[in-house]
């Protein structure tokens, strides 16, 4: 089973890379489960401007960056979206990355880790709404991080509560993916 951990911000000084690293540690060591970091900063996706919706493109993308993104997403069985809350929503770069693809997301399972001044709750709910267009299941357990108390210098300050939330979320994600693959 392969879980893609999507670092959903490309902003300078962002926290998503550090949070994604912490999430990867929470996935590590599980038998039969591997994780891969899908850092949107490394894909350099153009703004969505395809001549037709992705579902109609049949994976025939013109941009090499989109082709690489498509392959990376297609290779995963499920995802953990690590996203900050920007103006009560998801970052534009993450929405753009989601919008570029369609069949690659279909029938896969997702989970969300949000962070922000209000713990990223609104961004997670918006992300769930977006993902339900494609995914079979966006699991309910999530991790909510405060940028004031749970993150310092771009890294998660682990606590017993956060470690428990992460374990609960990853356990749920792995269980749903395993049932789907059975």
Q: What is the meaning of each model-derived region?
A:
Residues 2, 30, 40, 97, ...:
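Short, functionally important structural connectors and interaction interfaces within domains
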Residues 106-182:
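FMN-binding flavodoxin-like domain, especially the glycine-rich phosphate-binding loop
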Residues 57-135:
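Helix-loop-strand module that forms the ligand-binding subsite of alpha/beta enzymes
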Residues 1-83, 89-93, 156-182:
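N-terminal beta1-alpha1-beta2 submodule of the flavodoxin-like/Rossmannoid cofactor-binding fold
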């Amino acid at each position: 089973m392969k879980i893609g951990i999507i670092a959903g911000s490309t902003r300078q000084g962002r926290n998503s890379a550090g949070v994604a690293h912490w999430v990867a540690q929470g996935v590590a060591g599980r038998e039969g489960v591997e994780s891969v970091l899908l850092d949107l900063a490394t894909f350099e996706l153009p703004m969505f401007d395809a001549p037709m919706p992705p579902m109609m493109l049949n994976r025939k993308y013109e941009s090499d960056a989109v082709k690489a993104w498509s392959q990376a997403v297609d290779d995963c069985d499920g995802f953990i979206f690590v996203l900050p809350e920007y103006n009560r929503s998801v970052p534009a770069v993450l929405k753009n990355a989601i919008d570029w693809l369609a069949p690659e997301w279909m029938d896969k399972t997702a989970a969300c880790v949000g962070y922000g001044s209000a713990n990223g709750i609104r961004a997670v709910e918006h992300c769930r709404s977006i993902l339900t267009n494609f995914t079979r299941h966006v699991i309910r357990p999530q991790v909510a991080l405060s940028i004031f108390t749970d993150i310092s210098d771009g890294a998660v300050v682990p606590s017993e509560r956060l470690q428990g939330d992460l374990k609960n979320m990853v356990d749920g994600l792995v269980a749903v993916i395993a049932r789907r693959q059975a």
